[in-house]
């Protein structure tokens, strides 16, 4: 038990406080007599010091008052507990006397719950007791033996977070009437067996309550008090009346459980005693008791660590019955381990069986409604490994909901697998279902993939119908972020049964608009794809229009890639026309953010004579300025990369020409943020040239 210091504040402490107060008063008097000549600073300093002393003394007084209130409260609680202890001790003595003088009658035990403390902390008995049969072969033990065994049974248990804690711990008292010598509790087990059972559970710690040492101790109190468990907490409610529970012990063994209708919560009287099903055998040995209730025993103690009373009230008779069933079962029920973590694995193992048949529509609904990726993967695997008949059933279920699946994040993959594993009639049915929705599918981030897959698998008549529908909105779809990929797939498609010329129809639809398509982010990809996959006559009209508008296309963020493609892969007259267009605006293109990339591509991958032609254009001095365009390009944010490429990749004559012109403007280039890169490269090339010349001179002299 926690020791509590109940000493009141000593008179010496009070005397010291009074002396401090008198000392403070004297200081105030002295302060009042300060001469007028004393400085204001000294007076203020003394006032602050005095204020600090007064505050410290006031804190000491408050602390002593608080300690006094706490100790007074502890004294009142202990007095209440001691009075209740005396009442129960007197009751136990009267029970033992009654048992000793009248050993021939049947047993009737009345469980009385003494109310401890105020009404706020009152605890009521909340469990329906079961019929308890006592063994006839037991003999009356001595008072000493009962006390020893009861004290050994009444050990403490380490409290968990939800354990009952109370300094006013209620204990079921017992009033024994007409006790027989044959039906009394016996305690025959040894202390060693009990200790061995206790040591098996590390949660228990052992102590002997001071109540047990009383010579008037009643064994029934220990047994019943210990039948309080964490799992079966006895409940209370502030508004409930006092409850008295009458229990009669008999040798009968009822077979039907107690129904909620047999319990009256108002006075808690049992209407049908014969309906109690389970037994509480108070005469069980300590081994059985420790085995059957090791997880539910609670201490019978005055320890102050068990604070407050039980927390919640009783709401139904069913809850009362369940509490007593938990305590009275000889084999405590074991709560099955949760299988929630194993359910998904077991479920997927089951559904992965090769020929297992399920409601495919339910799984498809799960994909559409819940975006379930696992269901989509499962059906895709089924399409790969299942039998022919099962595949057809799955595909038929998918076709019935094909429109939402094609637009679904995970459902579109399932539809694509159906094009691979479905029969010809099913593929035709899926392709026909797409007609009338081509604009929506082609412009959808998931549907566009389904359309491309369908173009590879459907018959040409369905494919032609799809293309006809797309041509109705070619102005929108050919430059769309997703639909442009569908057009690229159409450009790559080979036609065998139908003499379809896609590019003729495309040129007719986009005549005069190719330069607009080429400068778009997605349209530029379409144009490049057409250059790679269409024959010369099909792409001629597009090429002519792009060369005519090459100035604007080369300066575009996306159009410059079209011109680069023509520079790298163009041939004959078309390439010559593109190079001439670039050289005519060489200076302007060299300092443009996007057109400079076209010039760089021409330096790296263009005709062999492009660098010489390019240098001729940028080294010609203008009439109004002595500084050559070469220096302006070398000092430009984008143009300096072009000069560096010429110094690194050009022919020796071309390199010498560039370096010769740059040396004349080294001061200007060194002062430029971007020109200094070119100046450094020129100096590096000069140093290497000097080293090589020295080596050559030495070699010649040696010879």
From Swiss-Prot:
Transmembrane segments: none annotated. Pumilio repeats lie at residues 361-396, 397-432, 433-468, 469-504, 509-544, 545-580, 581-616, 625-660. Residues 1-19, 245-258 have a biased composition (Polar residues). The keyword Phosphoprotein does not apply. InterPro entries: ARM-like (IPR011989), ARM-type_fold (IPR016024), PUM-HD (IPR033133), Pumilio_RNA-bd (IPR033712), Pumilio_RNA-bd_rpt (IPR001313). This is Meiotic coiled-coil protein 2. It comes from Schizosaccharomyces pombe (strain 972 / ATCC 24843). The lineage of its organism: Eukaryota, Fungi, Dikarya, Ascomycota, Taphrinomycotina. Residues 331-686 form the PUM-HD domain.
